Amino acid sequence: EVNGVRWNLFNLHLKSKWTERKDDPNANLRREKEARTIRDYLRKRFLPADGHPYLIAGDFNDHKNSAPLRRFLQVNDIALTEMVQCVDSNGHFWTHYYAKQDSYSRLDYLLASPSFFKRMVPESAFIADRHFSLWASDHRMIYADFEF
């Protein structure tokens, strides 16, 4: 609770795309099932019509148009969350560096309920990109400011 506003933060880490096996078709299925299970829990706990503010943050291990991400954005015509567009100081969107394949991807997201999204401070959503950003992890930190 902040300044009398009760809200919830959910942090998640969905199944990785990369496994020890070269071809792991179950990884995609598991990630989608994880997303659906979490989404269903949120829908039961927070009805969209109630307007309860919440934020989902974490490593979704998938691209922004993937089935797991879509599970969190809407059901039929009902918006569940809105994607917070984080960007680094160079205008880049990548949050993960995979050294083995020398590839950059956006796997980490902030998803805000419609009522929480309205509290976001304009132009406050960033991806940390200082020279030491990847020392602690292969993911870069994402963050945004919200007003209460």
Regions from the language model: what does each represent?
Residues 44-55, 61-148:
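Metal-dependent phosphoester-hydrolase catalytic domains
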Residues 33-44, 70:
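Solvent-exposed, polar/charged alpha-helical surfaces in well-ordered, non-transmembrane soluble domains
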